[in-house]
Curated annotation (Swiss-Prot):
Binding of (2S)-2-hydroxy-3-oxobutyl phosphate, residues: 91-92, 133
Record-given protein name: 6,7-dimethyl-8-ribityllumazine synthase
NCBIfam families assigned: lumazine-synth (TIGR00114)
Organism from which the protein derives: Nitrosomonas eutropha (strain DSM 101675 / C91 / Nm57)
Lineage: Bacteria, Pseudomonadati, Pseudomonadota, Betaproteobacteria, Nitrosomonadales
Pfam family, one: DMRL_synthase
Record's GO cellular component terms: cytosol; riboflavin synthase complex
HAMAP family named in the record: Lumazine_synth (MF_00178)
Recorded family membership: Belongs to the DMRL synthase family.
EC number annotated for this UniProt entry: 2.5.1.78
Catalytic reaction(s) noted: (2S)-2-hydroxy-3-oxobutyl phosphate + 5-amino-6-(D-ribitylamino)uracil = 6,7-dimethyl-8-(1-D-ribityl)lumazine + phosphate + 2 H2O + H(+)
Length: 165
């Protein structure tokens, strides 16, 4: 769909066929993390990503997710990565540190290694909020990963065609 005349618009799609997706999941707040994972992998399958093309790595907590994502990104095997976990507010400042630093780490890895990363780390005030959000957030991260993987591939092809001209 074109919104502006004479402007090239680059669209992406939600076709996951042929994409390889890496998932890093925190084991802290495991019930919520597993709920996110179930919704995410179900949606990935609906989008056409084959089970054999999905790799899951688990880590102790949200702060460990960026390092595991970095190791997956270095392998150059994945079209997109997904971070899953839950940071639930407690009575201390620790929540803010974990929520902010894990998000910062995801962005840093994605930009440094030129790979889309879908952030499925829930940050909520309590377990009830996390439970209420985990299904939609898990599915959403799958859609974001597939769409951004396709967009990155398209933009990469465009970049190669302009440099070879």
């Amino acid at each position: 769909m074109s919104y502006y005349d004479n402007i090239l618009e680059i669209d992406s799609d939600l076709n996951g066929n042929g994409l390889c997706i890496g998932i890093v999941m925190s084991r802290f707040n495991i019930d919520t993390s597993e709920g996110l994972l179930g919704a995410c992998t179900t949606e990935l399958a609906k989008l056409g990503v084959q089970e054999a093309d999905i790799v899951l790595v688990t880590v102790p907590g949200a702060l460990e997710i960026p390092l595991a994502l970095q190791k997956l990104a270095i392998s150059d095997r994945y079209d997109a990565l997904i971070a899953l976990g839950a940071v639930i507010h407690g009575e201390t400042y620790h929540f803010d540190v974990v929520a902010n630093e894990s998000a910062r780490g995801l962005i840093a890895v994605g930009l440094e290694y030129d790979i889309p990363i879908a952030n499925g780390i829930l940050t909520t005030d309590n377990e009830d909020q996390a439970t209420a959000r985990m299904t939609e957030k898990g599915a959403e991260t799958a859609r974001v990963a597939v769409e951004m993987a396709n967009l990155a591939l398209t933009l990469g092809e465009m970049d190669q065609s302009t440099t070879s001209s």
